[in-house]
Structure formats: structure tokens, C-alpha cells
């Protein structure tokens, strides 16, 4: 498994992810956001959707062109626009009001790899590159307790703030993980407990009553 920064905004390359395997796949087509990925060249890890032949989804531009998934290739081709070597993807751009803060916009893990820690490892892997680009702070807004926990594992901590759409705002210094406390970690989970989730979120939150912040996940070495 390798970590790669594909590019920085505002002229980053597009990345086409299979919308059947990745949440927010359409967000990674935009060139206005930076992108970083965890990918594999191991043929046993290359994954295509069970729907072997599929049309392009509504987020794609060439709606009239027939697209087919080829299980023998892991890079985009004329017949298959998706990069099947990607295990997890992260999009990012500078904060709109503070150009020293880098905002993580979307973190998406391939469906068969969710829960394996790839999200926080990817988020942590970008941090030294953000420092090299002059950023001193990282920020992300999360809309569910699973993402909250994952970003804690990447060194983020809840700020006590929410966005206008009830996402919890987490931050960390770019160079080192955030300093956090049991009370700070639990207070963010309490905000989610107020929202009366069903399973699996309710069980997840119940299992984290009176627990300390999770251990950090390690970054992945960069190929660049």
C-alpha cells in the first residue's frame, strides 16, 4: 500500500472513483480541490464492483458513452474511467478565510475496506506534506460518530464548534497531533448521543461511554 499526493489546488488532477464503491465519488472529479490517495498495485487487492458492466453515473460528464468495468486493469482506460487501485481518497483545500489552514473536505474509503483504519492513516499521511506547503493548521468537519472517531485516530480533536449543518469541527496542528483530554473527546460524542441515532451508530456510541480517546494510527510512507 502506498500514499500519493496527486496534486494541490487550484489545479489538481481529476480522480474518477467508482461511485458504486466510494461515497462522495463525484467530489473527487473536481480539479479545484487537492487529492491524496492510498493505493495498491497488488492484484489481489484490485477491486471492481460486482456490477461488471455499468453506465457512467450522473456525476460524470460523458453520459452518452458506454462504460464497462475491466477486472484486469487498475488504471483508467477509454472503456473504464475508474482508478481501481485506489483504496482510500482524501480531498482538501485551503480554508476560505485563513490561507494557513488546510481543510480536509472529503475522506472516502472503498466499501470493502471500511472499518480497517485506512481513513485515519490517509488523513495522517498528508500532514507532513501540508507542513511543506506552508500550512500550520488542519481542519475537518464530520457529520457522524464513525468519522469523529476516525479523525481522532488521525490526531484531530474536537474544537467545541459546529458548522451550520451540525457537523462537528475538529482541528490539529499540522506538525503534531492535537493535545486532547477525556472530557473533550467525550463531549463531542455526547453531541452525537443527543441526536437519537439508530444502530449501528447507537451501539457505537454506547460502547464508547467512559472510554479514553483512541490511539493514533500511523501514517503511510509517501511515494513522492
Task: Give names to the regions the model predicted.
Residues 88-90, 107:
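Conserved GNAT-family N-acetyltransferase fold
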Residues 109, 115-128, 153:
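Conserved acetyl-CoA-binding loop-helix of GNAT-fold acetyltransferases
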Residues 93:
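Segments forming oxygen-rich coordination pockets for charged ligands
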Residues 130-143:
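Conserved GNAT acetyl-CoA-binding A-motif
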Residues 142-165:
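Conserved active-site alpha-helix within GNAT-family acetyltransferase domains
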Residues 86-88, 119:
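Short, well-structured hydrophobic secondary-structure segments
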Residues 166-170:
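Minor-groove-contacting beta-hairpin "wing" of winged helix-turn-helix DNA-binding domains
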Amino acid at each position: 500500500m502506498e500514499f500519493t499526493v496527486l496534486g494541490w489546488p487550484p489545479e489538481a488532477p481529476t480522480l474518477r472513483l467508482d461511485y458504486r464503491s466510494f461515497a462522495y465519488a463525484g467530489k473527487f472529479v473536481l480539479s479545484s480541490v487537492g487529492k491524496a490517495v492510498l493505493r495498491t498495485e497488488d492484484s489481489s487487492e484490485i477491486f471492481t464492483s460486482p456490477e461488471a458492466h455499468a453506465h457512467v453515473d450522473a456525476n460524470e460528464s460523458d453520459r452518452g458513452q458506454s462504460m464497462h468495468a475491466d477486472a484486469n486493469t487498475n488504471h483508467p482506460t477509454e472503456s473504464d474511467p475508474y482508478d481501481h487501485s485506489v483504496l482510500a481518497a482524501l480531498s482538501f483545500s485551503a480554508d476560505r478565510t485563513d490561507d494557513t489552514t488546510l481543510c480536509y473536505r472529503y475522506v472516502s474509503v472503498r466499501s470493502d475496506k471500511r472499518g480497517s483504519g485506512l481513513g485515519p492513516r490517509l488523513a495522517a499521511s498528508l500532514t507532513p506534506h501540508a507542513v511543506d506547503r506552508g500550512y500550520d493548521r488542519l481542519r475537518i468537519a464530520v457529520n457522524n460518530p464513525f468519522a469523529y472517531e476516525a479523525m481522532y485516530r488521525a490526531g484531530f480533536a474536537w474544537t467545541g464548534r459546529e458548522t451550520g449543518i451540525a457537523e462537528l469541527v475538529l482541528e490539529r496542528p499540522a506538525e503534531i497531533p492535537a493535545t486532547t483530554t477525556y472530557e473533550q473527546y467525550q463531549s463531542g460524542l455526547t453531541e452525537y448521543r443527543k441526536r437519537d441515532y439508530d444502530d449501528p451508530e447507537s451501539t457505537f456510541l454506547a460502547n464508547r461511554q467512559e472510554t479514553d480517546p483512541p490511539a493514533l494510527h500511523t501514517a503511510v510512507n509517501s511515494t513522492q
